[in-house]
């Protein structure tokens, strides 16, 4: 597999390899590694970022490479140059590309037209690098045996929900998405895809509107911001009202297992999708989760540039 364009492209063997490598990088954070020595990685972002940019640049540096950060308005794409032409130019100068943008189709085309590995750092439809960081964190807390555990996402049925369901299906997990019906529910096609993967992996995929039922007995409660970049501001009041029952509160956390954890991909809006007492409380693992953005991107670059991921 040359690229990581979508979460669904990963096999279970790929994920296990990446998580093991990320855990190794985390245990030896200052170990010298020259996998990207004399190599350059382009980091192209049309969406502002804190974690993805920092994680990507430090991941490249930890592997001995040189990162080049490119803003959306730095390229000629905005003036009519094609994605195909841009992909060929970047491929000629760089050894890998990490992209964070809006349209999944742009990432897919960049992957198809590039001769170098392309990594999806986030789109409106998917967020594979975040899910790898999430699962390293889950394994640190619960180990590799997840039998009998339930992993629950609450809130907007967005790109994180999609990636959460797909990765959970790949991992053979019991995953739940608790979201409103209608326009803020996860894409039905993605849910169907997750269930198809689950039929082979033994996973259990649930989508519900009942936040309390979802939280009961959960090992993980996970959420994301309610207003993502690009969401229409005119819908804010309506969306906030629809999502209010899915806020992660102390009362909701009381329904979970004794050893449960709270996760959030960040940035967070305390008082909206999560209470401050939860995200800043003893069950929150958000800082370690954010740290693993670097270790997992580092693992991706290490294995993709060596041609060691097989895909599904």
Description of each model-found segment:
Residues 1-54, 58, 126:
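Positively charged, low-complexity intrinsically disordered leader regions
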Residues 40-41, 45-93:
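Active-site cofactor/substrate anionic-group-binding motifs, chiefly glycine-
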Residues 46-58, 142-223, 231:
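Glycine-rich phosphate/diphosphate-binding loop of Rossmann-like nucleotide-binding domains
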Residues 63, 93, 113-115, 171, ...:
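Short, structured coil segments at secondary-structure junctions
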Residues 95-167, 264:
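Anion-binding alpha/beta catalytic cores of soluble intermediary-metabolism enzymes, centered on
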Residues 195-277:
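Rossmann-like adenosine-cofactor binding region
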Residues 259-260, 265-312:
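Adenosine-phosphate binding glycine-rich loop
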